[in-house]
């Protein structure tokens, strides 16, 4: 779900934290991508002309494989070295949000069934998209595909976006890529958004610089996490009636969620806000401060040449993809991964800071030059 309104708050208070650019600007970069988020997007977006998902001859959905294969190739063609992180077991605290999602899926399926005799194709597709969920089998198929493509992946112990951030913090990758803004709660140096679908939708990639965001918001990590919880995250409900502007104002005035809760409880008559009963905000904060992740420094990432024959067996013979296109894709992978090895020029040079010269120094320098001319 992410954090409601956070993107706009950062744009407003820390505009220098934002950059927009194209895929080619990430040449030579290694990026950790939230695989679970990608697969969900592919199942929704990769469709036939009639709006239905891609399927094999046996009727099995293959939209997730098509998206993962071709969009990963586009990244590699642009000199990017992608790796993927898959979700592990969700934290207990996320159970409420997952239950809500399941209820929404059931409601969408029921509505789809109720209107199937009278609805237009567009309406049926809309309701079908609302019911999309990534299955365990689809996750496993995506992992098999990545292995055959020579692209590394990691199974996170818990949340994929937390593991992506951990890899970025450890210096194994340049950035974490996810649509979930709560990825910033794990303090990756950079968060990339729209990475895997920017070209398809003809939109730029957003990069958020964590350090500049904190400087602009004038917050430390824990205060920022408290802001995100107050805005609304996956781990607990928020205080009703508190929108982004009010949340930012309350955090600035009181400094922490603990102080906000205390203020509301001590002043019930002077505020319209009411703290949810047994509100687990402290537990949610702890999940962000100390996420369950595998240590990034212990993870070795290795990009290899694709296993072409096995790739053809899986994608063509088992899943019904075009052999010519799969073989062509494999060649692009080989070429792209070799090209990406060249790296970036800024990886070979360090930036040297130069102090600004004082006006007096400039005058002295000019004076000495004149003396020499004489």
From Swiss-Prot:
Organism ancestry: Eukaryota, Fungi, Dikarya, Ascomycota, Saccharomycotina
| Keyword Cytoplasm part of the UniProt annotation | no
Give an example GO cellular component term for this record.
nucleoplasm
Family matches, as Gene3D superfamilies: 5' to 3' exonuclease, C-terminal subdomain, 5'-nuclease
Listed HAMAP family: Fen
Annotated EC: 3.1.-.-
Q: Where is the composition biased (Basic and acidic residues)?
A: 354-365
Described by its record, this protein's role is as follows: Structure-specific nuclease with 5'-flap endonuclease and 5'-3' exonuclease activities involved in DNA replication and repair. During DNA replication, cleaves the 5'-overhanging flap structure that is generated by displacement synthesis when DNA polymerase encounters the 5'-end of a downstream Okazaki fragment. It enters the flap from the 5'-end and then tracks to cleave the flap base, leaving a nick for ligation. Also involved in the long patch base excision repair (LP-BER) pathway, by cleaving within the apurinic/apyrimidinic (AP) site-terminated flap.
Name of this protein: Flap endonuclease 1
Q: Which SMART domains match?
A: HhH2 (SM00279), XPGI (SM00484), XPGN (SM00485)
Q: Which residues bind Mg(2+) 1?
A: 34, 87, 159, 161
In terms of Pfam families, this protein maps to:
XPG_I, XPG_N
Q: Which GO terms describe its molecular function?
A: 5'-3' exonuclease activity; 5'-flap endonuclease activity; DNA binding; magnesium ion binding
Assembly and binders: Interacts with PCNA. Three molecules of FEN1 bind to one PCNA trimer with each molecule binding to one PCNA monomer. PCNA stimulates the nuclease activity without altering cleavage specificity.
Q: Where, in this chain's numbering, is DNA bound?
A: 47, 71, 159, 232, 234
